[in-house]
Every structure is written in C-alpha cells, then in structure tokens.
Amino acid sequence: MSRRPCSCALRPPRCSCSASPSAVTAAGRPRPSDSCKEESSTLSVKMKCDFNCNHVHSGLKLVKPDDIGRLVSYTPAYLEGSCKDCIKDYERLSCIGSPIVSPRIVQLETESKRLHNKENQHVQQTLNSTNEIEALETSRLYEDSGYSSFSLQSGLSEHEEGSLLEENFGDSLQSCLLQIQSPDQYPNKNLLPVLHFEKVVCSTLKKNAKRNPKVDREMLKEIIARGNFRLQNIIGRKMGLECVDILSELFRRGLRHVLATILAQLSDMDLINVSKVSTTWKKILEDDKGAFQLYSKAIQRVTENNNKFSPHASTREYVMFRTPLASVQKSAAQTSLKKDAQTKLSNQGDQKGSTYSRHNEFSEVAKTLKKNESLKACIRCNSPAKYDCYLQRATCKREGCGFDYCTKCLCNYHTTKDCSDGKLLKASCKIGPLPGTKKSKKNLRRL
C-alpha cells in the first residue's frame, strides 16, 4: 500500500506544526495515526489561538509603567496551549512596555471610567473656546481697573464712534444691570457697595474703550442712576470729625433696625430727653412705634404729676409784668389762697404762744411771698400785709383784721373804679429833687 498525505475536508491554514503521513484503512480511507491525531489537535489549538489573538489585538490598552513588571511574568489563561509564535509575540510586546490586557479587564475599565472621561472631554471642549475662557476670567474678581485697553486706537470717525458707543453702552449697561437685579446670576454676592460699583463701571469702560477711548461722564451718571448700588451706605465719610450725629446718620441711611435696637435700651425719661434734642431725633422717635408709645405714656404721666402737685395749676405762674388781664387773674388767685394763709398763721400763733414775736410773724409771712410781692404794715393794726406793686394793693394777713385796701387812696380795694373820687394819700414829708437834676444843682450853688 502506498502512503499519501492526509486529506481533510477543511484545510487549515499553514502552521509551524508539520503534518505527518497517515495509514490507509481497508476501506480505502486513511487511518488516523498518531501524527494525524497530533495534527488535528494542533489544528484546533491554532484556530483557537488565531481567534484569541485577533480578539486581543482588537482591544489593546496601554497600562501604567508600575504594572509592567507584574504583567511581564504573567501569562493569561487564554494563551495557554497556543502556538509558540503567539506566545513570543505576547512576550515581545510586554517587554516593549505596552502589555496586552485581558478583554474582560479592558471592558471593565472602560465601563468604570466612562463618565469621568466624558466629563474631562466636556471640560476640555469648553476650555478650548476663547469666548468661554474670557467669560470665566471675567466672572472672577480681578484687580484690573478697566483702563488697560485705552491705548488701543481705532480709525473710526466721530459719528461712527458715537453710534457704536451708544449701542455698545446700552448692551453692556443692560447686561451689568441684569447682574445687579438677579443676585443668583451674580458671581460675587458678598461684595461691598464700592467694589460692586467699581466692577460694573470698569467692565463697562473696558468694553467701550475699543470704540471710544475717552471717558464719558454722562455714561457714568447713567450707570449710577439706573443701578441700585447702595452708595449711601458707604462708611468713612465722617472720619476725623470731632462731633458726629450717629442717630441722624443711621436715619438717613435707612438703618431702622439699628435705631430700634438703640431706642429699646433707653428708659422713658431718656426718650423724653431724646425728643428735646432736635427735630430729627423726634422724627426718629416717632418712626419707632414701640419707643413712641413708651414716650407718649411717659409724657402723660409727667404732665399728670405736675398738675397734681402744682399749687397754681388753675392759673399761670406769677410774673412781674403781664398783659391787662393780669389784674383779673390776680384777684381770682388771691381769693382761693386767702383762707389757707390765715389758718396757717393762727395755728402757728397758738402753738408758740407768748414767745411768738413780731419779727417771727413777719418772717413767716415772708416765706409765702411771690416774686412780685413785698411786705408792708397794715394801716389799721400794723400787722404784716402783702403788697403787690403792680396792682397797688395790700392785704393784711392777721386773722382778726384781714383788711384789703388800695395803697393809693387807702380805701377798700376796688378793681373797676379809679381812685380819682377818693382822697389821695398825702406824703408826710416832701421829697426833694433827685440828685443830678437842675434843681439839685441850683440848690448846691446856693449853698
């Protein structure tokens, strides 16, 4: 029997493993010998190797250098039993520094880092655009004054510059005011009013400097008029002054909660004193409801106490000179006080008895005198009598006498009639001329 090579239905690709001849059976078909069995096993291994190699090369991934040493000495389970050439290729790639990782490991790593990679790509794309980078820079608080672009000159005419300035100023001012009105969109919420105003003005000037390098003061006034920058709350204007009205300054700035805290610490009498300082302080007191209620109650209580303890609450206080109605008020007041003074004198005379002298009697009456009154001796009993020089009236204070007379005519006191009908009081001695007059000088010359 002649020997011929084994013929299979599927001829595998050429491999490094050589096929050995096989014997032919009695039926005319070749008997699979040991070499043929080895060939078939090699074929299956080769096919598996080709499949696995292609799958691995389709999913290559570079690993960090720290993991190279660990992966060089490691042979994956799917390469066991494969051909020597594939194992050599695997070892060669691992020595270069780009080891092959299992497809399962590659799939797990890509799934775990997929979200992170997308975020990085999104951030990188946003940072690549110059417009968004400039917007990100302007959102931070830089110390740029806004005048750095004034050196840029443009060849535009004055008419074009004016029209472009108006359009650009309207857009920039509207965007700045939108940032002011919507605090959620404004990045720096904790800016002081001065820094806030500085940022808006500088950004507006920086945008308009390319069109017109000149500073337009009308534009600044319009920014101040449109935007609510709270510049009235700026502190430091009164620094260095000796006297500062703190309450008035707080009232002008609208800090009513601070004023309410201050007024709550004051007592009712202190609130009365606050109202007497100035009209502004009284307005501050009237603006606070709680403090004003306490103040009004204190005023009512003080007035009631004054009316209760004042001996002359029914009339006005006595003064030296009054209007023509003073005589009527005097007569009304004297009738009410006449009985009280007489009872006091009688009680004092009974207590002291014989030791009560004339001097003590006059001194006791003198304690009850008013500002425009004086003491005189009664024309009937020589007892102390009160004398009013404005009314020309004297009243005896002795209980047994009580004579009320006119000092001009020495008659009973008359309020409506004149003293012309009665006899006038004649002086007991003639009064000489006043010193320094012509008559006194003549008398001196005669002497």
UniProtKB/Swiss-Prot annotation:
Induction and repression of expression = Up-regulated at 7 days after osteogenic induction. Down-regulated in late G2 phase or mitosis. Down-regulated in G2 phase after DNA damage in a CDKN1A-dependent manner. Down-regulated in G1 phase when APC-FZR1 complex is active and accumulates at the G1-S transition, coincident with the inactivation of APC-FZR1 complex. At the G1-S transition, transcriptionally induced by the E2F transcription factor.
Outcome of mutating residue 401 to S, per the record?
Reduced inhibition of APC. Does not affect the FBXO5-mediated inhibitory activity against ubiquitin chain assembly. Does not affect the FBXO5-mediated inhibitory activity against ubiquitin chain assembly
**Region annotation Sufficient to suppress UBE2S activity: residue ranges?**
437-447
Q: Which domain of life is it from?
A: Eukaryota
* Interaction with EVI5 as annotated region, ranges: 135-244
Q: Where is the composition biased (Polar residues)?
A: 343-357
Residues binding Zn(2+) 1 are 378, 381, 396, 401
Q: Where are the zinc fingers (ZBR-type)?
A: 374-422
Annotated pathway: Protein modification; protein ubiquitination
Which residues, renumbered to this chain, carry the PTM Phosphoserine?
A: 94, 102
**Alphabetized GO MF terms:** anaphase-promoting complex binding; molecular function inhibitor activity; protein kinase binding; ubiquitin ligase inhibitor activity; zinc ion binding
What function does the entry list?
Answer: Regulator of APC activity during mitotic and meiotic cell cycle. During mitotic cell cycle plays a role as both substrate and inhibitor of APC-FZR1 complex. During G1 phase, plays a role as substrate of APC-FZR1 complex E3 ligase. Then switches as an inhibitor of APC-FZR1 complex during S and G2 leading to cell-cycle commitment.
Stated name of the protein: F-box only protein 5
Gene source species: Homo sapiens (Human)
Q: What is the lineage of its organism?
A: Eukaryota, Metazoa, Chordata, Craniata, Vertebrata
